Amino acid sequence: MKKHLLILLSILFSFKIAAQTEPVYSTDGNETWYYIQFQNGGAVLEDMGDNAKLLTKAAAKTDNQLWKVVGTKTSCTITSKNGRSIYYEGGRFGTSSTKKATLNLYSTTNASYKPAWEIQQEAGQSMNQWGGAGINKELGQWSANDVNNPLLFVSPKDIEIRGEEPKILKEYAYSSVGTKFAPEEMLTLWYKDPVTASTVTNPWMEFALPIGNGQFGGMIYGGIHQDRVQFNDKTLWTGSNKIRGAYQNFGCLYLENLDSIFSTETTLKGVKNYYRSLNLQNATGEVNYASPDLAIKYKKEYITSYPDQCIAIRLTASENGKINQKFYMYNPNGKETVYEDGAGVYYGKFQLVSYYAKMKVIPIGGTMTTDDTGITVKEADEVMIILAGGTNFNPAQLSYIDDASTLASKITERVDNAAKKTWTEIYDAHVKDYQAFFNRSKLTIEGAENTYDTKALVDRYNNTSINRTGKEPSSLMLELLYYNYGRYLLISSSRGVELPANLQGIWNNSANPPWQSDIHSNINVQMNYWPAESTNLSELHKPFLNYIYNMAIVHDEWKTYAKNSGQTKGWTCYTQNNIFGHSDFMENYVIANAWYCTHLWQHYRYTLDKDFLKNVAFPVMKSCTEYWMERLIQDRRVKDGTWVCPDEWSPEHGPGKEDATAHSQQLTWDLFNNTLHAIEALGDDAGVTPEFVTSLKDKFKNLDTGLHTEIVDGKTLLREWKYSSYSAGERRHRHMSHLICLYPGSQLSGTNEYFQPAVNSLLDRGDASTGWSMGWKINLWARALDGAHAHKILKAALKHSTSYGTDQSQGGIYYNLFDSHAPFQIDGNFGACSGVAEMLLQSHTDTIQILPALPPVWVKGSAVGLRTTNNFEVDQYWDNGKAEYAVIHSGSGATCAIKYPNIDKAIVKDASDNEVSATVVNSNTITFPTKAGEKYTVHINDPVGIGTVSANNSSFKIEVQGNKVMILGNGFEKVDIVEANGAKIATMSKASFELPNTNGKVYILSIHKQGNKMVESAKISF
């Protein structure tokens, strides 16, 4: 019967009461009690005590949340069951036993929430969830009909009581692994303490470790006594296409240790040899520890599988029958978990989406029992837990949702299918799937060593007495980890549903995260995808690109915003966006559409995928171009005849509205330039009229480029505003919106007259800033071809941040290597990752620039598998700060152009070791033809040539090309060839020969001359 009841309940997903009538007014001896529940977010009012501020809370069984209304609709008082009445003072509502306010119940006209009520203390001003919807909000006053005003009077029998959050258990006493420990895999984050032992105010943000399959993911706490996996799904949002809402915490899975051999009080019964880790090479979290006597070793493994669409956890021990655990879940958004037959389920509904989560416990050996509090396993050999969750969100539906009645069966099927498999089957499929992306590219920095735990790496990096030169093994290791972590996070947060990674990727433990963890269009979501193409993760760009297509072409909201701005064609969006097409904040910032289009074009430039260009990118770009061709006006201030963007904003400072901001003009330049190139690439498939092309070219020809200068303190800077002066903004502002032309755009190169003013502006902006801002600056300094300064910013970006609230002076990282704005924002992780790639390889000019901004501290290393425009993949090797050789993999057979100092002397060979004829453009640039699917080795300083030639005024000249050696001069007889260690290679009677295995070798040549006993020597170093 319980199972049938669960199935029936699981399709209801009821969040709000459908109808709302006027509350019954209480009188003496006839009292009616209500929960007062806000429509947006579902929180209820709670009496916090005498003369205390009123707060919003999750509904619970407490008299503090029960209220009676006395009087009439237009003149009433509201009093809690504890006898305290609502009053208004000092800009906030509170409760008091001696004070009360005369209130009015106003019937809201908010279209999203009516029928509902608003509580007013004065006409036109309503009680409002201050700072956004959610729990723990103070109540202020705001204009009537705001989305955070409407509320319902809900009978106690109808309220949805949320499950009680599990009591947090004190961590066991423990000791960590010794100082000689090092992880097996170099690319591993590892720690000596469980998150559950931390005393910081936000251990989730500081220490928990992320896992994810692109859409569904979790944060691992690594606890021993009571472990926790907080989990998310990218589609779990409050709000709708009319209400911003916020990204939500899906809930928590708890694993409680029932072993009696451990104790919280004494190290005699404490855990031994504890450590937890996140292996970036196989996307696996682990917790390892031993029993107090070291006899039993325990391990927990955590993955989020893309093939099986679930979080999978395995618990093992070195002896059978030693796993004793209890498993339970917590739903922070609604109903309690229902447990049955080794499984747990909870579900609910927000304004638009319904959600469903299920976990299943699969023990091997031992016993398993289930009751209303969870699932208990005793004396098992091994336990596997499968956890899945999702919503009925569907971006292909105009309503954004599917029928909720099928959601439970979809998630249940997902869990059951995974539960039928062995751990090995699930794990092997996960690793194979993940490594197909991660292993495409590898960065090596010689000297890096992972011999300190990651917290210690961060501390050592920030200790100037330790990190003195930047070449210390621990310093190099942190930089190497941080780059690879960026690629790991992108794989883990950008697959599956056609939605981009948001401000926090997919990881969020709050009902009201900073900036709602939204899709922020004025830098943040774009930065999330900067490393996608260059670090060889092109497919992971697609969720963002397809999101743009869906919003711009399939759905209507963004087209409506275009009409609202006065245009009849095209689409646009504003600064803050949810997943349902809703967009708001700074509604004159409409240039975001052009910025989005640069991503569509970049994907084509890197892949040369004509189908994508024709069917996805170009329709969006053309529509956006039509919008701007219609919106542009001729300059109305200086009247120079140029076309300018009206009433724009340079995020997030300076004039709130001004024509021709550098930011908007540069992005429009990019849009028009890229659209013309797209038309050329598509030919007739572009489907545009000659009149359209002519009009576009005319607008482009006379477009203000956004490149203007001004003199500040004797230096020529790029202007941020065409009209307003430098002083209109903040000198050290975090946004560098007027430098789009330098990065991520490609309007400027080193030969452009505006290049140096742009660099001067960058220098003037300063170094330290928010985390994401420093991520941007790494890329900008790389484009400025200054590797030392780019590395200086990277070093600042790796400063440990000590703030978990909004604090723009606390940019850096947390100990889990999450980027800190502060607080956590994932864009900084991706910006730094992209910045490292830009230091090592650039191709925005369609010329591959080898090591354009190599930091001096990265003396020797390799970068394998980075990608460039024109569908090339490049492997680079360097030593002593100089490129030795590069391997070019041609994906489409385009002509390859390469730039590096004195590359005109390089030798190019194909895979068969045949020399390829290269055209010398200048001493620093060559080009050569390629064939699709072929690879080419460019020997730059490989070999470096003759080291020394000695012997009485040598009569021979030696030339080296590749591994070919030619001895020129009269009287040659033979040459003896030995390695530097004395090993003889050969004696050659010909003056032209090839040397084997040249990379890194040193050969000594002893040249014999006819009729002369003298031997002349030469040394050749490769």
What are these regions (language model features)?
Residues 944-950, 1000-1022:
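C-terminal tail/sorting-segment detector
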Residues 505, 509-510, 522, 643-647, ...:
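C-terminal catalytic domain of Rieske-type non-heme iron oxygenases
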Residues 1-21:
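Bacterial Sec-dependent N-terminal signal peptides
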Residues 947-976, 992-1000:
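Glycine-centered coil/turn sites that cap beta-strands in beta-rich domains
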Residues 168-585, 597, 602-604, 622-626, ...:
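Aromatic-residue-lined binding/catalytic grooves and analogous aromatic/hydrophobic interfacial grooves
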Residues 20-171:
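Lectin-like carbohydrate-binding module/patch detector with strong preference for beta-trefoil
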